[in-house]
């Protein structure tokens, strides 16, 4: 580095910890040397968040949050705004890809035991991020003012009316009116624009917490507690390598593959057969005509299936609402439900592995059932898979403590 650059960097470092931040979070942040395919999804989640924020701001420049103009403004963006169709499809495709990446990232956490000590708070921040993501997606779902988005929002907002005593007042407060209207659209647009920046702040906290406790790995072994000394530093973990350049370059390979898939979907199949963009949403909202079948967007369908699986009690859908929210909130207590002496799925016994497999099948099945029209048979299946979903968590203290585990090596494996 030239003397001039060194002098400029020194001037900055005296006023802002630029070099220290670079060292602490990149060049001298030591990550386990055995990170595999599953480690890609953290960086891909950041990438998709950036895509959503940038494209969302661009769309907001031409979108009209007005019940009489919203649908037309989306069509205007698609037809008359330069590259508007591309930005709109980037945003709609990015929303689904964001959830795909996050679901895989959370599954990685289950496989590696990334919710266990000392990462309980890291996991809980991640669950808060997931909740804010769902809220952001829900508020944004109404904005195109299409037929399915209108009636989907109507169904979800009506769930607040199921809350005893205050339900009716609560649903009116959420809508800002007695029905989904211009007032609802305005407040949903405001929240949809604001929440991604809150999400970015939570992601920052998530990364700070991660770098404080250190990255987990497929073996679930804490490299900070192992032997010290490697080719870069005598004080660094022996099984760690600098995040930069090793994992930044590796993540770039993942980004290239991801963007290739992203681009294929965006250019050749942006609706994904109605999963990413539903056909009724290409029709303007009609409050006087209810669609034959109302279903939320695919990343909400597991919880929607749980809602429909619970029969009403005294004419109220409140028990289903409780089950739906409990299915998400139970993730907060996961770190204290797992009593296994080992973290990683590699060394857990067959009972835990079978339980996790059944849990994954149940979640995917519920996602599919949530899209299907209601029927007695589908309701029965939803009830079975809902029970299996909750059994995974509620029975975990028992089967995780009884299961036979494999011996864990002292150092990470290659």
UniProtKB/Swiss-Prot annotation:
| InterPro entries per UniProt | Cyt_b/b6_C, Cyt_b/b6_C_sf, Cyt_b/b6_N, Cytb/b6-like_sf, Cytochrome_b, Cytochrome_b_N_euk/bac, Di-haem_cyt_TM
Question: What cofactor is this protein dependent on?
Answer: heme b
Question: Could you tell me the membrane topology recorded for this protein?
Answer: Multi-pass membrane protein
Chain sites annotated for binding heme b b562: 91, 192
| CDD domains attached to this UniProt entry | Cytochrome_b_N
Task: Look up the domain of life of the source.
Answer: Bacteria
Any one Gene Ontology biological process term? respiratory electron transport chain
Question: Mind listing the GO molecular function terms for this protein?
Answer: metal ion binding; ubiquinol-cytochrome-c reductase activity
The entry's protein name is: Cytochrome b
Source organism of the structure? Allochromatium vinosum (strain ATCC 17899 / DSM 180 / NBRC 103801 / NCIMB 10441 / D) (Chromatium vinosum)
